[in-house]
Amino acid sequence: MNFDIVQRRLSLADDVVDSDSPMQEQDELPMTQIPGDSSANVLISTQVQSKLDEMELKKVMKKNLTQFAFESLGATESAPPSRAATPPAKATKRKKSTKAAGRTSTGTGKKRKRTPSSIKSITQFNTENYESLADNRRSRHVVSLLSGKKKKIKDIIDRLQVEDASGSPGPSKSHFSTYSPHEWSHILQLLKSKFPKCPPGQVEAVYKYVYGGAEKDNVWYSSQMPPSDPETQASQEFHYNAQQPMVFSLSQAVEEEFVDAESPALISESFGREQMKGPSFLDEQCISDTTDETGVELKIDEDVARAFRTRMLQPYWLREDVKMKEQPGVSGDKLMKSSSGAARPKEQRWLHLSYNGVDDATKNFPKSPTSTPEPRSGPQVLQRHTYRTPSGLAGRDQLIDLTQCSFNAVKSLISPLKSEVQVPATRTTTWNDKNHSRPQNYGALHQKVQLRLCGGIADSEIYSTLRSRQVVWRLQDFDLQDSEEETKYQLLELDFETVDSKVDLSTAPHHRLSVIKSPTSIASPGDLCDFEVSVKRNASVPPSLPLSAKNLRESLRAIGLKPARTRSEMAEQMGCASQHLIGENAQEQRQGLFDQFTHLVEQSPSLLEKVYTFEPLVLSELIDFLVQKDPFIDKIDDSTIKQWADQMGICLRSAAED
């Protein structure tokens, strides 16, 4: 018996069984298998298949090429035998016309004409015709907005463009129509009704949009514009250079010597005469603008510098008509002389410098020997309603108040200062008007001040004290309500008297102040008013400023106190809280309460031991202990103590759990 034959038959039988049940073979497969080395066979089969694909592609390509009757050996040889026997069909040739044959024989073919008006470059066309295109676009947009008919505007402008290009009227369109008299009247009515009601700013904006005035300021549109004419630029540069700017040095601007303020005409004449003297005279007045030796020189005229400084020292709020109304029958020269007396300090006399003539302030400074003071009537000073505080007036040493903060001295000016030089703060005033006599005649502007009252401001923003003259509070009858705002506002009027005292705000209405306008702006330099507002921001409400019971109750709950029944009791609680608690708002005062509780618990070793061991504390016993240490805690709400215990990780329980 041949065992090899038997083994081969058994293996074939196993293969037959495996082919009958493929799912069983998958179930019997182990979890991990070692793949056989079949990479070489895969590579060989891939190469063979790629060669077969290339051969098939070549056959398809040759088969497609045989459809064309090319007179080439490659095409005929590669054609299949069935198609090689049949001759290819001849293509029909189109006969040339007699005109084309004549042009070909003579050699003069039809050429394309180039017109100079054709667009060679779209970029060049847009650059050259930018302004006309922009005007066309703006006018089309404006008229379409006024009429509301964009299609009609487009048809009209397109027809006009065709007529301008060809010189003959273009073809008429069926849907084309011009404006009727009724439509033109409608546009005219829109213009008459809209433009008178528009502010000048909107009218100017429309004008600039239509005529292209605003595009020069835009970087993109200005870059698209063609370059301007060189002759125009030369004329503009000459006109600009003809006017020499006024340049002043720091010493000339702040010098103490100056003469009468000359009129602009005389200043220009003197400046012109000095220019005619030649370069030698101008070189004497040259002052370098930089510290390095660059040779740059600036021509400065002393008379112009003095006149400029005089104009700088004039206050914006100086109004001569107000003083003329207060003193009828008194001329301007007499009023100026009477207002500038010897008792007035130097800084105050500086405020009266103007073009109206010689002022007494010039007597305090040495005049130039060449100056001849002559009273002249200069231009009228413009009336400006811009008010400034005394600290912002020119000529006063009040630019930096040392009572408020310190400051570091700069070293960029040529002065050799060290970088660490610091001017310390002080409690004494640094103003130069200590001997200033305060007049008692206050104008009507300082008698009444209107305050805007806001009902939605927080309690911490209440002004508690006001130090000034005697104040009388008056609440206006009407409400100032804006349609866009939800909060309500009211006007409160204050009348001041000349008696200096601490004001009691008990007569103030039941509102909270949001804005206090200090009447430091004065109508004349003589009517200086020292209106001081002492503001104390505290969450507690002072008893001098009564509020409603609802606001007091909300304030007490925000701090963590028990709200009382009556309003007077709640006011007492707020006063007591302001004495015990420190903080600017309710959150800070509430945190101060928590810190006080923690400090009291840390003083008791037995209570602190229970806290460290997480032993529950009876709430009533904890409250009794805290009240025994500080009686003020009796007014604290129990929920506040529970919140503090929860924040500190202290376990609490009630007495009923025992």
From Swiss-Prot:
Keywords annotated in UniProt: DNA damage, DNA recombination, DNA repair, Nucleus, Phosphoprotein
GO MF terms here are: 5'-flap endonuclease activity
PTM (free text): Phosphorylated in response to DNA damage.
Question: What are the Polar residues biased-composition ranges?
Answer: 365-374
GO cellular component, alphabetical, reads: Slx1-Slx4 complex
Q: Identify the stretch(es) annotated as Disordered.
A: 17-37, 74-123, 327-383
- Protein location: Nucleus
Report the main location listed first in the record.
Answer: nucleus
One Gene Ontology BP term is: DNA recombination
Keyword Membrane recorded: no
Q: Which ranges are annotated Low complexity under compositional bias?
A: 75-90, 99-108
Q: Does the keyword Cytoplasm apply?
A: no
Family in the record = Belongs to the SLX4 family.
The record's note on quaternary structure and interaction partners says: Forms a heterodimer with SLX1.
User: Its function?
Assistant: Regulatory subunit of the SLX1-SLX4 structure-specific endonuclease that resolves DNA secondary structures generated during DNA repair and recombination. Has endonuclease activity towards branched DNA substrates, introducing single-strand cuts in duplex DNA close to junctions with ss-DNA.
The molecule here is called Structure-specific endonuclease subunit SLX4
